[in-house]
């Protein structure tokens, strides 16, 4: 019942049972908040069960990194979810009828899961109302004590103007997410009037 454009950019992780799995982003043209959990049997064998292998994951359609935290006993990720309020927005040209979910990257959220299948949005890290020209994407990160340090491929206005679109990054940005386990950080809200 799913419509896929592609599966790509998997993240290898050890599941709660101690087995190696690949959590793969899925470009599902309808929702874009879906990922696939593929089991690694050995060096030459992976398996996927369509009845149980899909998981609802905020931002599962865009590249993400998942890491396990021994302190909280949870898996964590930074992702770009697809909010309904953004899905219906329009702009000139490419986005004259709507913005496709694969391009919604203006909100970066911290998510957690105890089992890699059930994901919860903990808190927004960055939230911009400009889904056409702002993008905080392809984020890679590490734990740093009680914080997360992250690098984002970012599309954002600068002295030469706007980036071509949110996917076409014009800078790399560094972020520190303070006290991530307790969501002790402040969301960076960006309101951009020149849409």
PLM region descriptions:
Residues 8-11, 62-65, 137-140:
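Beta-propeller and closely related beta-sheet repeat lectin domains
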Residues 1-5, 9, 13-58, 68-132, ...:
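Beta-rich carbohydrate-recognition and catalytic domains
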């Amino acid at each position: 019942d799913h419509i896929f454009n592609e599966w790509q950019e998997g993240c290898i992780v050890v599941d709660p049972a101690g087995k190696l799995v690949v959590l793969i982003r899925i470009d599902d043209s309808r929702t874009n908040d879906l990922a696939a959990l593929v089991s690694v049997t050995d060096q030459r064998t992976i398996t996927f069960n369509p009845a149980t292998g899909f998981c609802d994951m905020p931002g599962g359609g865009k590249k993400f990194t998942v890491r396990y935290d021994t302190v909280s006993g949870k898996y964590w990720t930074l992702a770009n979810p697809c909010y309904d309020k953004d899905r219906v927005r329009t702009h000139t040209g490419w986005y004259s009828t709507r913005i496709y979910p694969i391009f919604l990257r203006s909100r970066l959220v911290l998510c957690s899961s105890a089992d890699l299948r059930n994901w919860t949005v903990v808190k927004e890290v960055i939230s911009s109302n400009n889904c056409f020209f702002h993008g905080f994407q392809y984020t890679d990160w590490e734990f740093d004590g009680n914080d997360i340090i992250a690098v984002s491929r970012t599309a954002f206005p600068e002295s030469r103007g706007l980036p071509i679109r949110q996917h076409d990054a014009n800078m790399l940005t560094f972020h520190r997410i303070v006290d991530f386990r307790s969501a002790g950080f402040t969301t960076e809200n960006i309101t951009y009037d020149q849409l």
